[in-house]
Amino acid sequence: LPKSKGGKLPDDLYNIITDEEKRKKLVVYINPPYAESGSTKKRDAKVGVNESMIHKRIFSKLSSYSKRELFAQFLARIYIEIPNCKIANFSTLKNLQSSYFSDFREIFRAKLAKIFLAPADTFDNVKGKFPIGFFVWDSNINEKFHEIIADVYEKDGEESIERKRIFSYEEGKYINDWLRPTWNKNINEI
């Protein structure tokens, strides 16, 4: 609702969102929160950070890891509350590939229209050697993610000749499924 009707949304923004023609030109730049609730063996790690309105409304029924991720809640909320929009974000690939995000992929069914990858250490204060994906989603098209071909960029910004095929692995076994039966808990190794 707009502020003039007791809501939190500025009236001008509300008018744009509710007008189909104006909404086509709307671009919202938001830095989604990247935090995850949980605990470690030694200490609590941001316990309760996931307790949001969207968590209670949508993710409370799920029993997966994805509901602990604020960026997943953020994407789901945009998808549900601002229909028929384009969403762009950057993150790791876990929302596409992780078995923990299969429940999220059931809810968030915007078509992944385009993705490109860059090394994580391209960003300030990131030391890891893993890809960061720049995603463009189209919520006009209801489609569960299964796979896509991504362009790959090097740290210097040059496009690599390599392209990467990214899967959701919904039907396949993960490496842990293969390793778990051979794991020896007494000596903590395979």
Language model: regions and residue ranges:
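Conserved S-adenosyl-L-methionine
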Residues: 1-3
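Short, surface-exposed amphipathic charged segments that create phosphate/polyanion-binding patches used
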Residues: 10-12, 127-136
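A mobile, often basic/glycine-rich helix-loop segment
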Residues: 34-67
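Conserved Class I SAM-dependent methyltransferase catalytic core
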Residues: 60-120, 135
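C-terminal substrate-recognition regions of SAM-dependent nucleic acid methyltransferases
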Residues: 131-190
